[in-house]
Amino acid sequence: MDQSVCNGISYKETGYFSQLVLDFLAEHPHIRSFYTHSPLKPDVEALIRAKKAHPQQRDVLVKALQQQYAGLDTDPAVQRNISLLEQPDTFTICTAHQPNIFTGYLYFAYKVLQTVKMAEAWKAQYPQYDFVPVYYMGSEDNDLDELGSIYLKDQTLTWNTTQEGAVGRMRPEGLDALIAQVEKLLGYGEHAEELVQLLRKAYLGHDNIQEATLYLVNALFGRYGVVVLIPDTPLFKQQYIPVMREELWHQTSHKLVSDTI
């Protein structure tokens, strides 16, 4: 095998990244003051110390997650990780993404799997701690133009719906037709039938997109212990009440932002 095909290319050579992203990855001195930790060699122990010093409501987190997973066939790895979140020496490796239908772009999977890889690597390096991979679902995003399409075999498949508002709360009406298009395009390819059945169970067997996405991500990544967090949950939003009250009475964010200008 020609080993040259296995060589990587730099982010710059792809032409897909802005200069700001390239400077960030290169840790260019002119932007280094805008962030604390290196993207290449983060000081994990410093991160842990900072998180330990920050107030945490682990009981609320675990209770909300248990409610979200109620009735779902959950892998033991996920159950274990949710339980671990109660412990003070457990920390999360998070990625966030909107609930694109059928996961949307391929990098959705890359992002989730990267949390798994980091959690495993950091556990090996710091065995006294536990690290839980978490997918934080941005289910209140209302950009259906972005979230309502997938790209398969050079074709764009779009969900035709008149619903508006938070995509995660939308009903999956009409997605049966889109799944049928996916089935036709996949044909008899490897794992095609398995994938189509998974999409049907996820989207046609649940009341809204965020529940469908939870099911889908759990089916795909639950074996790796990935925990899905849906922030559009009353128990989580109740924790934000003091922040909103502070903002209404004192406009704290305006003062903080003004100090940075």
Predicted regions and their residues:
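N-terminal targeting/trafficking signals and adjacent low-complexity tails
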Residues: M1-I261
